[in-house]
Design a protein with these regions (language model features):
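Cytosolic catalytic domains that perform sulfur/thiol-centered chemistry
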Residues: 1-263
């Protein structure tokens, strides 16, 4: 399943009423003003996680599984996440389901703004959540931890991508106890992937990420694992096989005095 879906294709799915769950990842304050018909509202921006210790990951997995169970996802369910544009919370939703080996997942390219511009219907009523115990199998190959990164900093076959702004990367915008970035990380602001609310073409994305060796292990991070999820999706669309997201991101790394930083 492609990681992106266009408005036209999603509209056809809503008409067929097939086994597709549409998840609006925006805050309820935006959802209630209008959303895609049938969409469930789950504000994924509330699911920050800054502890990637063994215990922390165990708790993250348990709590995320509980959250996904409220959406009613079965093995055969197609899941479409969206936010206002091809943004960070929809990408986080895609990453979450891939973490649980659920590959029938994508995000709406252009998000709700594109859906509305294209003239597709909008509804105001809320749709009830439908519980179904989510049983996805964890895929640790796409999740990075702080300890894993620290052990691998000298590995030439590792590329770390900092998806934050230039100001956060160089330390002039401080959002943790310490400023700066993870040593050796390259800075590619996630916003450079987006044009008029949509992902740029694969040709343009390929040029953006041309300095990343195809065979390297790539780890993306940001402040809280959302912008990094967007870059994760972009890299997967380009065919990179070994991509992980560091969910703790700078919210964990920048607040741990035992970890190295660069400015």
């Amino acid at each position: 399943m492609s990681l992106l879906i266009l408005s036209e294709e999603l509209y056809r799915k809503t008409q067929k009423r097939d086994d597709t769950v549409i998840v609006d990842t925006r805050p309820f304050s935006e959802f209630k003003k209008g959303h895609i018909p049938g969409a469930l509202n789950v504000d994924l921006f509330q699911l920050h996680w800054f502890d990637t210790s063994k215990r922390g990951i165990k708790n993250f997995t348990r709590q995320t599984r509980m959250m996904l169970s409220t959406i009613g996802i079965k093995k055969e369910t197609n899941v479409v996440f969206y936010d206002n544009v091809s943004g960070i919370t929809a990408a986080r939703g895609v990453w979450l389901l891939l973490y649980f080996s659920h590959e029938r997942v994508c995000m709406l390219d252009g998000g709700f703004e594109k859906w509305r511009r294209d003239g597709y219907p909008v509804e105001l009523k809320s749709n009830p959540l439908q519980y179904h115990k989510f049983r996805g199998k964890v895929d640790n190959s796409i999740l990075a931890t702080a300890n894993e990164i620290e052990r691998s900093l000298e590995n030439k076959n590792l590329t770390i991508v900092d998806a934050r702004s230039k100001e956060e990367y160089n330390g002039s915008d401080v959002r943790a106890v310490r400023r700066g970035h993870i040593p050796s990380a390259m800075n590619i602001d996630w916003q450079i992937d987006i044009e008029n609310g949509n992902f740029k073409s694969k040709d343009k994305l390929s040029r953006i990420y041309s300095k990343i060796p195809r065979n390297n292990q790539v780890i993306t991070y940001c402040q809280g694992g959302y912008r990094a999820a967007n870059v994760f999706v972009a890299l997967k669309m380009l065919g990179y096989k070994k991509v992980k997201m560091y969910i703790g991101s700078w919210g964990e790394w920048g607040n741990r005095p035992d970890l190295p930083v660069s400015e």
